[in-house]
Amino acid sequence: MSTLHKVKAYFGMAPMEDYDDEYYDDRSPTHGYGRSRFEEGYGRYEGRDYSDLRGDPTGYLPLGYRGGYGDEHRFRPREFDRPDLSRPRLGSWLRNSTRGALAMDPRRMAMLFDEGSPLSKITTLRPKDYSEARTIGERFRDGTPVIIDLVSMDNADAKRLVDFAAGLAFALRGSFDKVATKVFLLSPADVDVSPEERRRIAETGFYAYQ
């Protein structure tokens, strides 16, 4: 094409069909808004519950793949992450083990009730009802320290036995002391039980093993 014809085509004096140049091509431009490589391969994922981007005018990303997991949480606490409330705490376990060790320690018990100790003749009675009060009175009258364990008795009978034992201690100049819950020590006049010895009786749980 001559230079004059190109000038005419530029100013509209010649039809564009006659304008033939190496830079002009009626084909689609090489760089444009054609289908992207992503869209060309998109059809392979249409059957797997992926959100469709092509019809979304907002251009936001899809929520993602919805298959397989549903609406459940992706992460759940593992079994060993959950606190097990049925297990005992360490502090309570140590306290219980300490009491158990004291109760089963033969050396502590031997020191407390060795020969010559005022408590060497001690006996433990576990009355079931008030009718056994006579046995308690006879042991106490004979000069034997008596541990009275009323745990298995109902409160009414236990109260009557406590009153009876307190009366015995007063009448015969003895002593009547509480060792533990519903457990009492009735001591004759010639047996002096110190507060430390009463504490050791409670700690060793001696009355529970007689």
Swiss-Prot record:
Q: Cite the entry's keywords alphabetically.
A: Cell cycle, Cell division, Cytoplasm, Septation
Which Gene Ontology BP terms does the record give?
Answer: division septum assembly; FtsZ-dependent cytokinesis
One GO term describing the cellular component: cytoplasm
Q: Which Pfam families match?
A: SepF
- Keyword Cell cycle among UniProt keywords: yes
List locations, semicolon-separated. Answer: Cytoplasm
Specify the domain of life of the species encoding this protein: Bacteria
Does the record carry Cytoplasm as a key word?
Answer: yes
Which protein family is it in?
Answer: Belongs to the SepF family.
Describe the function of this protein.
Answer: Cell division protein that is part of the divisome complex and is recruited early to the Z-ring. Probably stimulates Z-ring formation, perhaps through the cross-linking of FtsZ protofilaments. Its function overlaps with FtsA.
Q: Which HAMAP family match?
A: SepF
Q: How does it assemble?
A: Homodimer. Interacts with FtsZ.
Quote the protein name from its UniProt record: Cell division protein SepF
Organism for this UniProt entry: Mycobacterium leprae (strain TN)
Question: Could you read off the lineage of the organism from its UniProt record?
Answer: Bacteria, Bacillati, Actinomycetota, Actinomycetes, Mycobacteriales
